[in-house]
UniProtKB/Swiss-Prot annotation:
Designated name of the protein: Oligopeptide transport ATP-binding protein OppD
Membrane topology of this protein: Peripheral membrane protein
Disulfide linkage: none
Source organism per UniProt: Bacillus subtilis (strain 168)
Deletion phenotype: Inactivation of the gene results in a sporulation-defective phenotype. Disruption confers resistance to bialaphos.
Gene3D superfamilies tied to this protein: P-loop containing nucleotide triphosphate hydrolases
GO annotation (BP), single: transmembrane transport
Main location as per UniProt: membrane
Catalytic activities: a [peptide](out) + ATP + H2O = a [peptide](in) + ADP + phosphate + H(+)
Function according to Swiss-Prot or TrEMBL: Part of the ABC transporter complex OppABCDF involved in the uptake of oligopeptides. Probably responsible for energy coupling to the transport system. Required for sporulation and genetic competence.
GO molecular function, one term: transmembrane transporter activity
Length: 358
């Protein structure tokens, strides 16, 4: 029997920001977990709360204006929320590494990349100057930078965007963190370089056996890198499941919308891509009931009155939608989504259990 060890567990996390316009409820009761060696992708539109969630784990949210309303962030069983800034400095980099969105601004332009990598080592390990430089060269080689002995002495402006992102990944891995948070690491890169970085991250995970939280708005990216997916909308997780469950048995209308709006290689080029109507809600005054109801063509009366609970579809698949209630009418997802579901119909065993969970 394989023993799965839980690395991270986020319980009922709620984070708000105080602004002149009122309290912005950026995260509203988020729950998820991550096991050792696993990759979890958190997906959603801009403003859904993905980056705030990742920054909360690292405790990088500026306070004020941000503050934790409630919840726990358990890393190896220890709650990070009450830790002081000094205590968190021993966690950041050493236990949890982070790759930020834009490699162009993540590096100090006046400092050689080798020195920026060795700074991480000096902070978290007792290591000599020579050993640190050797380790920096090894890390650059690990992330696929050619001639690392030479390039370790170069400045960021001497690297392309893709190579800079590789340097940022090397910095994040320098102290061998148990968890790596990648916050849209391919957003600022062109498509071919994106593919290389994604391939690199898959390769690195096999080599160093780290757990990864991958933040993205691109479902196409998710299919390549993740084991499980959490779909976020308006500060809440509305659906979570394995990659196959999210792509080939999605149950939430928002997930349907994301999948239907995604182009595929099978597209003839003649059909129009589906767009999700409307805009995300204003979280200074979150809507009553289901936050997605105003944008959903499947919304029922109860969606505007009561917030839906989580419904369990399988041991790994949970959905926050009244459509899964036994009394709800049976509805069909958009044709573009049904086509994807048919594609894997023979290999994917559909769960039959649907019940409400606490």
């Amino acid at each position: 029997m394989i023993r799965v060890t839980r690395l991270l567990e986020v319980k009922d996390l709620a984070i708000s920001f105080k602004t002149y316009g009122g309290e912005v409820q950026a995260i509203r009761g988020v729950n998820f977990h991550l096991d050792k060696g696993e990759t979890l992708a958190i997906v959603g539109e801009s403003g859904s709360g993905k980056s705030v969630t990742s920054q909360a784990i690292m405790k990088l949210i500026p306070m004020p204006p941000g503050y934790f309303k409630r919840g726990e962030i358990l890393f190896e069983g220890k709650d990070l929320v009450p830790l002081s800034e000094k205590e968190m400095q021993n966690v950041r980099g050493k236990e949890i590494g982070m790759i930020f969105q834009d490699p162009m601004t993540s590096l100090n332009p006046t400092m050689k990349v080798g020195k920026q990598i060795t700074e991480v080592l000096f902070k978290h390990e007792k290591i000599s100057k020579e050993a640190a430089k050797k380790r920096a060269v090894e890390l650059l080689e690990l992330v696929g930078i050619p001639m690392p002995e030479k390039r370790v002495n170069q400045f960021p402006h001497e690297f392309s965007g893709g190579m800079r992102q590789r340097v940022v990944i090397a910095m994040a891995l320098a102290a061998n963190p148990k968890l790596l948070i990648a916050d849209e690491p391919t957003t600022a890169l062109d498509v071919t370089i994106q593919a290389q970085i994604l391939e690199l991250m898959k390769d690195l995970q096999k080599k160093i056996d780290t757990s990864i939280i991958f933040i993205t708005h691109d479902l196409g990216v998710v299919a390549n890198v993740a084991d499980r997916v959490a779909v976020m909308y308006a500060g809440q997780i509305v659906e979570t499941g394995t990659v196959d469950e999210i792509f080939y048995d999605p149950r939430h209308p928002y997930t349907w919308g994301l999948l239907a709006s995604m182009p595929t290689l099978e597209s003839s080029g003649e059909e129009e891509l589906t767009a999700i109507p409307g805009t995300p809600p204003d979280l200074t005054n979150p809507p009553k009931g289901d936050a997605f109801a105003l944008r959903s063509s499947y919304a029922m009366k109860i969606d505007f009155e009561q917030e839906p609970p989580m419904f369990k579809v399988s041991d790994t698949h949970y959905v926050k939608s009244w459509l899964l209630h036994p009394d709800a009418p049976k509805v069909e997802p958009p044709e573009a989504v049904k086509a994807k579901m048919r594609k894997l119909a023979n290999t994917f065993e559909k769960p039959v259990l649907v019940r409400e969970v606490e």
